[in-house]
Amino acid sequence: MALATGAKYYHSCINCGGINTDTRNEKGLPCEVCLPFEDGDVLKGLKLNNSLKGYEKYWNLNQQYKEFEEFFFSKINKKPTGYQRFWAKRLLLSKSFTLVAPTGVGKTTFGLISALWIAKKGGKVALVFPTVSLVEQAAKRLIEFSKEDEDVNILFYTSSLKKKEREKFEKNFSEGNYDILVISSQFISKRKEQLSQKVFDLVFVDDVDAVLKSSKNIDTLLNMIGISQKAIDSTLDNLKKGNNSDKIQIEEKAPKGRLIVSSATAKPKGIKPLLFRELLGFEIGRFTTSARNITNVRIKEKSLEKLLYIINLLKDGILLFVPTEEEGKEIANYLEEHGVKLGKTWEDFEKSFEKFKEGSLQLLCGIYSYYGKLVRGIDLPLRIKFAVFWGTPSFKFSTKLENAPRFILERNFQDYLENNPKLKAYFKDLQRLSTEKLRKSVEKYISPETWEKLIQKNFPTTKFDKEKNLIVIPDVYTYIQASGRTSRIFGTSLTKGISILFEEDDSLFELLKARLLYLTEEEWTEEGEIEHLVKEAEETRKAISTDSSSKDMKSRMIIVESPTKAQTISKFLEKSSTRRYGSLMVHESITQEGILLLTASKGHLYDLETKTGLHGVEINDGRFIPYYNSIKRCSSCGAQFTDELPRCPYCNSDKIDDKKKILEALRDIAMEVDEVIIATDPDVEGEKIGWDISQYIKPVNKNVQRIEMHEITKFGFDKAIRNRRNCDVNLVKSQIVRRIEDRWVGFELSLRLQKNFQNSNLSAGRVQSTVLGWILEKEIEHSKSKKTVTQFTLDNGFKFEVDGKIDVDEVEVEIVEEKEQALSPLPPFNTPSLLTAASQQFKLPVQQIMEILQTLFELGFITYHRTDSTRISSTGQKIARSYLEKIGKITLLSEREWGKEGAHEAIRPVKPISPEELSEFITEKIAAYLSPMHIKVYSLIFNRFMASQMTSPVVINQKILIKNGSFQVEREVPVKLQEEGWNIFNPITVYTPFEEKKYSVVSKRTYTTHTVPLFTQASLIEEMQKRNIGRPSTYAKIVDILFKRKYIIEDVYKRLRTTALGRKVYSYLSERYMNYINEETTRQLEKLMESVETGEKDYQSVLKNLYEELNEILIKN
């Protein structure tokens, strides 16, 4: 089977940038024009053909890297590590960047050898170190490395130089008699005028924190790589005004050299550090990582005796976190009295830290605040093994109106406004109100009784202390930061850590547990495991040898579809820096496996063009060759097109955003990394986007793989990475067939419609036209199905209907039987059933619901939302179990799979987090912001999923006969809940039991109805699934396009009706082209597409059949 489709892609030839086939791109070959033959050396072939162009850049990089690697090896007898390999490629591509990496991977070594490399090539280098001693050490190492490189002149300056040495330095420095200049951060500050006049090919800053202490140093560094002061001042001025720095002339901005800086330990402050982003395309990064290998243990008995027992069990390498200095002193005294050697952050900490570092102290004791000395300030991967918390770190907030913080005021007032529409219209944007004005408004409109109820309602997952008028919220970020000291990346290994929490309060512990699970997906274990865990922690540190950095690490680029998804992933991976590549933002993260660069393609990059062949498909010797061009979008009118045009074909604007720029940026990054992983959506469209990117990147990086993320969580990410694969070419071919069929039939039918109706907004397609026919047929059936009914309401509130116009004042009820019935749960949602339920419940258009689902998926709240499956995996079942355990309802668990193993699951929550908890997490800024409607849709999904994994509730049903002289009707009514089950999530309506007696009719209403209901958006999608027309990914789009073309409208009851235009269009199409828009033909075509997906049918033979069909349409013209 061919590993390519034979399609032709514009801009994809690695040499000329012209059209190339995906077949040749897969092989890493330029197009046939550049290289007519496939055999032999590519570079030689291009030279012989006199066609060498862009390929030379790629070839040069590979050659230069081989030379650099040999040079590197010659200096330290080791090849570059994965980190150093990645940095070297960036260096060779003349890029400026931040070195973001853990301790022990050779950042300084890389800087020194890079300096020698540049110097050997005739360039000038400045190396900047934070202290004089480090300058001397670096100079010494450089001299050692350069013994065989006699032509490299190394000049360094320290304050300890003797007078003659200083005079010699000054002469050589002023005259530029050096290849490598080694200086301190202080030298940068003092010699600004001189350094600003010099231009270096490379400036390497070993400790950027020291340089950033003075903002003037930033100007100096930028001057040193050839950026003019005018460009710096203009960029700074634009930053202050919020303007675009791209307006500055390119020649003024363009650096002549490269700037490489080490990562910062603290976030750079002020506006000046933003110059690096604006002028060099990178932000000063900090080494942060989400990589954690921590086991959490809760100990409920909170006594000093128990604490001492645990400390003696752990022995050494302990951080003890306490809530206050006062309590800390009491604990420290007790431990010292019992022989524990410890230091305290509030008492000669620097001395204690050094003693702890060298091993003469077992334990350091400090206060657990987010910026505490022990929480953030230390990094000793081999020394710190255990974190012990004396109580849960938490925030306490007053609930008294006069003292309540803003978030409580805002949350409660927002809720109050929901039930007061007029007031809500007045208070449109609470964000604009000052806190005091907000407080006064709350006091004015909300009574103390209502306020207390709102507190209880809106903060259900916090600990509420009614006596002290406080709510207590766990400080989960401090807990994560502090416990994270125990598990660090050192070199290329991740140490094991143990976090032990002493907490008596069950409710507070559960609150922390839920938040920790949401953010880190970590679980808790029992106290009995501690001894085993201690051994594990020791073993991971013993395994870390001094040459652990020799283990090869990979640099990888991961490409997702949307920036939102990229942002979500970067949060749980914890991005260390952000870099701009053209129009792409790239987040850089450090994981245990190496460096990850995360970016987004922003959807499809290629689509069929229209001009070549038959609507973008060339027919050559019986084969169909699609031509794909980059998607262009007009910035003025928003129109999309693919043809190579200098102006928008719709509004004539020359402001065109071409996705070719994204492709070029992705190829550029691919040259830097070891591997590329494509993580587009797990469906046919995602596969095609992945394929388009893959074939474009393959010429510069053959290591391209595909992953499917069915949930955007750390668990989903790790699982996907473990199951990497190649792109599925059958899925790609299936999408090609769908797109060509849509283009051929859709274009031809649309052109005929537009010509006949003189309306360029009209369109047609198999599925949309078939569905339009259903709506029209349903209207006809509906109009013929009128009947009269009377609705009665009895004096016990029960309602029922009877056919005909009937006028009675009382009825008699006879109880036929009473019986128990177990009510089975509904299956979890798939796309059609969820669209139906959400549309009915919230009265939203299905397209809007799909957008809400897309957001919930991309932000990591639900599984993939385009699915026909109702299957629940073992992971999903564990989520249900975990939540029921948390709320004390585990006896109601009844795990169900609901379907066979397949590519997708049902739509379900990805974590055991209730809608109420999620609302709390949003308020606490733990979770990304969601609108109230997003929460409602999530609640619908959560409740249906939980119900699907629970026991069936048992009800007592009464079968009753309601009769009168003119009618009798039978009804079955639940009158008692015998056993609870899934009803705790989806309540069951239970009626008051009937008695055998006469009931009065308290109201009656006679009206005309129809036995055949019109379609709603929800029922139409149900029908599409039932009749196998369309797919989960297209249901909502089909309905949406019928609205956009003004073929259908919704009446006041949200029912679908055809417009006069819709009826005329369908009449025209059905009279002339019924064979192409009838249901059976459309269904058979869906089956053909599926057979291409599975590899049963060759996509070329299917295209041939479609082409023959199209010819019939063309003949009918």
UniProtKB/Swiss-Prot annotation:
Zn(2+) 1 binds at C13, C16, C31, C34. Residues 551-1117 are annotated as: Topoisomerase I. GO terms for molecular function: ATP binding; ATP hydrolysis activity; DNA binding; DNA topoisomerase type II (double strand cut, ATP-hydrolyzing) activity; reverse gyrase activity; zinc ion binding. Residues 88-284 form the Helicase ATP-binding domain. A zinc finger (RG N-terminal-type) spans 3-42. A motif (DEAD box) lies at residues 206-209. Residues 728-1114 form the Topo IA-type catalytic domain. The active site is at Y864 (o-(5'-phospho-dna)-tyrosine intermediate). Monomer. This is Reverse gyrase. It comes from Caldanaerobacter subterraneus subsp. tengcongensis (strain DSM 15242 / JCM 11007 / NBRC 100824 / MB4) (Thermoanaerobacter tengcongensis).
